[in-house]
Amino acid sequence: MSKPSLELKGASFTLSVLHINSSDLNAVMAELDSKLAQAPQFFLGAPLVVNLSAIQDNDFNLHGLKELLLSRQLVIVGITGATIALSNQAKTLGLAIVKAGKQSVTPPPAPRQTKVLKQNIRSGQQVYAKNGDLIIFGAVGNGAEVIADGSIHIYGALRGKAMAGAAGDSSAVIIAHSLEAELVSIAGQYWLAENLQQHSSDKSGCIRLNGESLIVESLPL
């Protein structure tokens, strides 16, 4: 029997959500450009859901926002939290109306294994610890990426990007002897360098989630 030419299957994907808090597109783009400049490769070509719950102006220029994001190689796949008028505008632009999913009461499975590296991770290199924690005895240089479904422990300086809880584990942490990162992320919540500098002074620390916000705690290393 021949295989069907198509199949419809359920699947879940992790999408970044861009919260728009102002109707002033010039102000929105200026702030976005500042964030993109700090981590351009992290957002390049990224599919986005735009949250418009803070926008009550039914004349908001959604088409203009879409074009401005496309010019920066960001792709809107849908909107959420919009008024009826803005939802109708989105439909004419071919955008999906995304409803926020219910929060799962089942915690993600605990990491099953640990990946240990005794080396520096240099610019352009990427390391991924699937289904587990990542321990690095060395530094993570600028332009390098370290990713783990569990926690990330760096016994050295973190100057690149570190993304823990990549599969949704909100209990994951990022620990480093020196926090100088370009970007840190836990379960999709992220800080860019400017956010990290506001909360840390390049010293050893542990970054974790507190609710839906990241916090950093000093470590006596």
From Swiss-Prot:
Keyword tags: Cell cycle, Cell division, Septation
One GO biological process term is: cell morphogenesis
Coiled-coil intervals: none
Q: Mind telling me which InterPro entries this protein's record contains?
A: CAP/MinC_C, MinC, MinC_C_sf, MinC_N, Septum_form_inhib_MinC_C
Q: Does the keyword Secreted apply?
A: no
Q: Does the keyword Cell division apply?
A: yes
Q: Where are the transmembrane segments?
A: none
Q: Matching NCBIfam families, A to Z?
A: minC (TIGR01222)
User: What is the annotated role of this protein in its UniProt record?
Assistant: Cell division inhibitor that blocks the formation of polar Z ring septums. Rapidly oscillates between the poles of the cell to destabilize FtsZ filaments that have formed before they mature into polar Z rings. Prevents FtsZ polymerization.
Q: Which family does it belong to?
A: Belongs to the MinC family.
Question: What assembly does the database describe for this protein?
Answer: Interacts with MinD and FtsZ.
Protein name as annotated: Probable septum site-determining protein MinC
- Where is the organism placed in the taxonomic lineage, from the top? Bacteria, Pseudomonadati, Pseudomonadota, Gammaproteobacteria, Alteromonadales
